[in-house]
């Protein structure tokens, strides 16, 4: 099984997962994908304690980065090839999915693009409440374009932390807007402050729900 969910930051980030029927039915051969805001790499958290919490889940955890990650901590883990894309192995059963990659999982293709801005940030909070690396870069966009080209500009699923700018609401990413225009995708899942469907865009905003993709 492959499932997606929203942010799991905070010391109680895994508590709702342990109460979820979908998660409880999973095994270590199944993947739960956190769409940005994974508590394992949350800034100023107890890394060892967080790793234990996530390894105690019944499933394996994949995640993309968002606006709350410690990017210095992420950078300590080297890249490895896996299922068609690049990953960072954080611990056994906990894996970071790099930006702009197209992965093959369970017979489906997944374009992933982490990264999300922090609103109203200033230099005083730099490397404390926000990191420059959290913004999607031109290099990230180019990586996605090259990998999509290799896959015929097609992905069964797109997984992002932010959303395309033209989809309504404050903020949003111009890079993701361009990728949405260029990519022939099935369903787009992205993190947000509430769970809601965006049928006009074949998209789902995910907060607390755990959604099985089969």
Predicted regions and their residues:
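Core catalytic region of metal-dependent phosphoesterases/phosphodiesterases
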Residues: 5, 10-104, 181, 206-209
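Active-site-proximal segments of metal-dependent phosphoesterases and phosphodiesterases across multiple
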Residues: 39, 43-51, 149-184
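Beta-strand-turn-beta hairpins that frame and shape the catalytic cleft
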Residues: 1-3, 101-112, 157, 199-203, ...
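Short, charged N-terminal beta->alpha structural module
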Residues: 1-20, 117-129
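Histidine-centered catalytic micro-motifs
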Residues: 8, 162-164, 185-196
């Amino acid at each position: 099984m492959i499932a997606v969910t929203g942010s799991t930051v905070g010391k109680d980030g895994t508590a709702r997962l342990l109460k979820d029927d979908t998660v409880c039915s999973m095994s270590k051969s199944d993947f739960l994908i956190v769409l940005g805001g994974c508590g394992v790499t949350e800034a100023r958290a107890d890394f060892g304690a967080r790793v234990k919490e996530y390894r105690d889940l019944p499933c394996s955890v994949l995640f993309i980065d968002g606006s709350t990650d410690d990017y210095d901590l992420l950078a300590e883990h080297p890249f490895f090839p896996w299922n068609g894309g690049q990953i960072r192995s954080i611990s056994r059963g906990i894996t970071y999915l790099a930006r702009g990659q197209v992965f093959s999982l369970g017979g489906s293709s997944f374009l992933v693009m982490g990264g999300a801005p922090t609103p109203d940030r200033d230099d005083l909070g730099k490397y404390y409440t926000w990191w420059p690396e959290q913004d999607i870069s031109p290099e990230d966009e180019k990586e996605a374009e090259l990998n999509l080209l290799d896959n015929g500009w097609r992905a069964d699923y797109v997984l992002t932390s932010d959303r395309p700018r033209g989809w309504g609401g404050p903020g949003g990413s111009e890079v993701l807007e361009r990728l949405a225009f260029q990519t022939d995708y099935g369903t787009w899942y992205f993190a947000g402050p509430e769970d809601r469907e965006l049928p006009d865009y074949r998209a789902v905003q995910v907060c607390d729900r755990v959604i099985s993709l089969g």
